[in-house]
Amino acid sequence: MADSRDPASDQMKQWKEQRAPQKPDVLTTGGGNPIGDKLNIMTAGPRGPLLVQDVVFTDEMAHFDRERIPERVVHAKGAGAFGYFEVTHDITRYSKAKVFEHIGKRTPIAVRFSTVAGESGSADTVRDPRGFAVKFYTEDGNWDLVGNNTPIFFIRDAMLFPSFIHSQKRNPQTHLKDPDMVWDFWSLCPESLHQVTFLFSDRGIPDGHRHMNGYGSHTFKLVNANGEAVYCKFHYKTDQGIKNLPVEEAGRLAQEDPDYGLRDLFNAIASGNYPSWTFYIQVMTFKEAETFPFNPFDLTKVWPHKDYPLIPVGKLVLNRNPANYFAEVEQMAFDPSNMPPGIEPSPDKMLQGRLFAYPDTHRHRLGPNYLQIPVNCPYRARVANYQRDGPMCMHDNQGGAPNYYPNSFSAPEQQGSALEHHSQCSADVKRFNSANEDNVTQVRTFYTKVLNEEERKRLCENIANHLKDAQLFIQRKAVKNFTDVHPDYGARVQALLDQYNSQKPKNAIHTYVQAGSHIAAKGKANL
């Protein structure tokens, strides 16, 4: 019944009711000129041609032609919300960041949840990691914690990131999702085993956005007021409890309600059922990092909680839906290099790569002045620098202040207290190969100790159901990697693949050639 619809379905009705006492606004052009007729174009006679002087039409159509901005190359499908972060435990011994200044302090936040590989209109219930990015609007500028719903990732070296994403996207010729591409990359990069195993476990399809954890994933550095530093990892655990979707239910929702996660989040907040997450850190001293049994900056591994327990810090609460999706979610831009004093990057190779990649793609997608867009603006800090001009400069461009540094005219000065913590690095400069670092020990622990028997069974079924569509030689490479983790892991997946492979094969298209250039060259030669 229409009377029992959810808040998302009734958005238009509620908007009208909120404006009930007001008269409708006067319809205008983009330039603010009142419009007398919005239904009929201006023509020379009832059957004549359109007149170029019909600026009502040209203003509308020209803007419509430019409505779309470039889609995010990853994390294109997403949902956003706003709220606050509240400190519940003192960690000033670790960090001088103002966001952690005292117990009870609240900092405004913006959060975006997303899938990774799908396009903007893709389903929310696919098996894919979820982005879980948090923007803290602090007095020292924005802090963007650009995380996922998994504590690990597929790769540990940023050089592989473009190829990894290409393998998860569409085939360059068929424009279809291609299991050959997906599993060829994963099987050739065994460092992906930890994340692949997590992805095909029950947690690979969260029940919406409210029932999953978030992780900063990378290793970061915290610096206190005395200049003392430690390494840390960030965790945010859902207070709603972990809930995942069975494969069949996820498939049904993908067809019947592909925006399931977006709808669930909007309706929960609109109904006053504000989702929250408890925020924790793990801490490791520099001395501990030197003797750690593996690289503490390796994004494919976790820090054991028994050795580095979770330290409670605060709570994330989401209590406001976006007023306009495009303005506040599609234009939202997260940048891992946005770190206020007290929070710094570690040598994590993936984090180091993201420090460049994220602001670079935002400048492409939103323009060089994307930080002036209201949702991205560090509105609780006063931005004062020597950056000027550029497309879509929306403020006063810092008026008549000098645009060079140093200068003698009382323009912005550097602040010594904001200097980064000193770091020590190896003097050896080369491309260090990390591909053969231990890729199986933590995966074995996850498989044998974290998952129970039923969960292991579903894991192997999920993998085989996806891997079966790849070519046999790729299947064999993948199974070898699973066997390296644990013989039972590989044997179960292989047994299921044998069942699939014994059935009549489906028609498959495998087109990995560079024929186009050869054909073109041959054609030119025959001219």
Swiss-Prot record:
Residues where Phosphoserine is found: 9, 417, 434, 517
Enzyme kind, highest EC tier: oxidoreductase
Modification type N6-acetyllysine: residues: 233, 306, 449, 480
Keywords: Acetylation, Heme, Hydrogen peroxide, Iron, Metal-binding, Mitogen, NADP, Oxidoreductase, Peroxidase, Peroxisome, Phosphoprotein
PROSITE patterns: CATALASE_1, CATALASE_2, CATALASE_3
Tissue specificity of this protein: Expressed in renal proximal tubules (at protein level).
SMART domains: Catalase (SM01060)
Organism of derivation: Rattus norvegicus (Rat)
Name this polypeptide is given: Catalase
